[in-house]
From Swiss-Prot:
It is found in: Periplasm. It comes from Escherichia coli O17:K52:H18 (strain UMN026 / ExPEC). One of its GO terms (cellular component) is periplasmic space. This is Protein YceI. Keywords: Periplasm, Signal. It comes from the Bacteria.
Length: 191
């Protein structure tokens, strides 16, 4: 009986310790500590940079068990900004993002794997009415206590998507078939 009680207590402690390791975070967009950026070559001569100004998301981070990590992000595609009003209007049109019909893009992770010091985050990206798997390579920038009594964790992730994979058929030339994604987020741990 003592062995059973001891085993049950040990198992209970192990379960409690394991579940306490994973932490849930809300992306800190209000504090301007998160960015969803992209770049694409312009006719093969230069890079055109842009950002989405309105998005929201959460992530679960467990440094010891990446398989338990999760990422969920929703982007308001009408918030696209390339620092040029007419171009932004064109990007919102049916030629590109078709924001009248598809005002949101979403990313929901399906797996997270450790790759050396990096994390490979694979998930379903829904953009322009099409859902495709995308893998982002992420790096932990840092984590710890903040000056206001909370805890934070920050990551930077990069990936590529092909325009035609998401039913964006406007041809900008051979050097402009893919978009680079550059995402930087800082999350505030939820209590």
């Amino acid at each position: 009986m003592k062995k059973s009680l001891l085993g049950l207590t040990f198992a209970s402690l192990m379960f409690s310790a394991g579940s306490a390791v994973a932490a849930d975070y809300k992306i800190d967009k209000e504090g301007q500590h998160a960015f969803v950026n992209f770049r694409i070559q312009h006719l093969g001569y230069s890079w055109l940079y842009g950002t989405f100004k309105d998005f929201d998301g959460t992530f679960t981070f467990d440094e010891k068990n990446p398989a338990a990590d999760k990422v969920n992000v929703t982007i308001n595609t009408t918030s696209v900004d390339t620092n040029h009003a007419e171009r932004d209007k064109h990007l919102r049109s049916a030629d590109f993002l078709n924001t009248a019909k598809y005002p949101q893009a979403t990313f929901t992770s399906t797996s997270v794997k450790k790759d050396g010091d990096d994390l490979d985050i694979t998930g379903d990206l829904t953009l322009n009415g099409v859902t495709k798997p995308v893998t982002l390579e992420a790096k932990l920038i840092g984590q710890g206590d903040d000056p206001w009594g909370g805890k934070r964790a920050g990551f930077e992730a990069e990936g590529k998507i092909k325009l035609k994979d998401f039913n964006i058929k406007t041809d900008l030339g051979p050097a402009s078939q893919e978009v680079d994604l550059i995402i930087s987020v800082e999350g505030v741990q939820q209590k």
